[in-house]
Regions:
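Juxtamembrane extramembrane loops of integral membrane proteins
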Residues: 4-48
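Soluble non-cytosolic domains of exported or imported proteins
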Residues: 5, 34-38, 70-74, 115, ...
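A short, well-structured edge-of-sheet supersecondary motif
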Residues: 6-16, 162-184
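Short beta->alpha transition motifs characteristic of CBS
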Residues: 21-26, 111-112, 180-184
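Sec-exported extracytoplasmic/periplasmic mature domains
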Residues: 45-49, 85, 112, 151, ...
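Small/polar-residue-rich segments within soluble enzyme cores
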Residues: 46, 58-136, 140
């Protein structure tokens, strides 16, 4: 069984979502519940044609429990579920989504498979983001709208000057808050 590990949302200064956990699924197979392995193989291949027929056949015959596919899309989960196969087990897990990853990837960072922050804001505020006694989200001083405008201008400047990379920092001089931080 997969453990569910929750993590708080990260928001910008205006309450715009930067990062959130969602429940996603892995598909596993419990072979003792598969009645007709040939039919099962054909049905699964219709939904997941990228799977190796040979490996799937081998796993069905040699394994008691194996992963069919990790990190299913919603469409894949729905189609597999609609097959009505009792041998397909859906294991929930918490996946971290970053709706504005193109704007914040260097700043927000990422988490590992066990939901521990390994870089950026995710690492620095790891303890706070995992504190289940307080459901308040982490609100940053960053502004998504300003971040977008500055990123666009920085990209244009990189093109004009044929630069390999660039960075920008916008800080409120009165209080020290970071409004935008970009690295390209």
């Amino acid at each position: 069984k997969s453990k569910i590990s929750l993590r708080k949302d990260i928001l910008d200064r205006n309450g715009i979502l930067i990062s959130r956990n969602i429940t996603a699924y892995h598909a596993a197979v419990k072979t003792s519940l598969v009645k007709d392995k040939k039919k099962f193989l054909v049905k699964v291949k219709l939904v997941l044609p990228e799977l190796s027929t040979q490996k799937l056949r081998k796993d069905l015959n040699e394994e008691k429990y194996f992963y069919l596919k990790k990190r299913l899309s919603n469409d894949q989960k729905s189609k597999l579920w609609s097959l009505g196969e009792k041998g397909i087990i859906f294991e929930p897990f918490q996946a971290r989504v970053y709706p504005h990853s193109d704007l914040y990837s260097h700043v927000v960072g990422q988490i590992d498979y066990d939901n521990y922050g390994i870089s950026g804001v995710e690492k620095h505020y790891d303890y706070f983001l995992k504190d289940i006694n307080n459901n308040k989200p982490l609100q940053l001083s960053l502004d998504t709208n300003v971040q977008f405008v500055i990123k666009t201008e920085l990209e244009n400047s990189l093109d004009v000057f044929k630069a390999k990379g660039g960075a920008s920092l916008l800080m409120d001089a009165d209080n020290g808050e970071i409004i935008s931080l970009i690295s390209l």
